[in-house]
Amino acid sequence: MTTEKKTMNISEIQELLPHRYPFLLIDRVIDFQEEKYLHAIKNVSVNEPQFTGHFPQLPVFPGVLILEAMAQATGLLAFKSFGAPTENELYYFASVDGAKFRKPVVPGDQMIIEVEFLKERRGIAAFKGVAKVDGEVVCSAELKCARREF
């Protein structure tokens, strides 16, 4: 029995997330299941603006942006699980706990972002997230996002 994967292209991602270049950090969703998990891709290019200063001689993708990519993935999963945003609504990145950075991410890498839904209460959703490159975990954390009007 084959299970068809649910995906999202960049247009579908932009319908749910307010982020745009250079801060939209999810390129494609390769699989998700509402209220369960979401797997997404972030292609890391040397042409991204952060590499002019982090670091010019040895470019390393900033860890805080890996966490932001995971946070964006949680927002996508939350909207897919609990309904699309209204015109004045979005998911804010509320907290991160236990972040661990295990290996540098460099231009040319393709990060696979995996977030797993844990629970939701009063508009705050909790997730476990990992980022992988070539099957190896480069970052892990627990994240929360809060659905709010702006």
Swiss-Prot record:
A GO cellular-component term linked to this record: membrane
Protein EC: 4.2.1.59
CDD domains: FabZ
Catalytic activity: a (3R)-hydroxyacyl-[ACP] = a (2E)-enoyl-[ACP] + H2O
Xref: Pfam families: FabA (PF07977)
SUPFAM superfamilies per the UniProt record, alphabetical: Thioesterase/thiol ester dehydrase-isomerase
Keyword vocabulary terms for this entry: Cytoplasm, Lipid A biosynthesis, Lipid biosynthesis, Lipid metabolism, Lyase
GO biological process: fatty acid biosynthetic process; lipid A biosynthetic process
Catalytic residues of the enzyme: 54
GO MF term (any one): (3R)-hydroxyacyl-[acyl-carrier-protein] dehydratase activity
Signal sequence range: none
Transmembrane portions of the chain: none
InterPro entries from the UniProt entry: FabA_FabZ, FabZ, HotDog_dom_sf
Subcellular locations according to the entry: Cytoplasm
Primary subcellular site in the record, as a coarse category: cytoplasm
Record-linked HAMAP family: FabZ
Entry's family note: Belongs to the thioester dehydratase family. FabZ subfamily.
Function: Involved in unsaturated fatty acids biosynthesis. Catalyzes the dehydration of short chain beta-hydroxyacyl-ACPs and long chain saturated and unsaturated beta-hydroxyacyl-ACPs.
Matches recorded under PANTHER family: 3-HYDROXYACYL-[ACYL-CARRIER-PROTEIN] DEHYDRATASE
NCBIfam families xrefs: fabZ, PRK00006.1
Listed name of the protein: 3-hydroxyacyl-[acyl-carrier-protein] dehydratase FabZ
Native source organism of the sequence: Vibrio campbellii (strain ATCC BAA-1116)
Gene that specifies this protein: fabZ
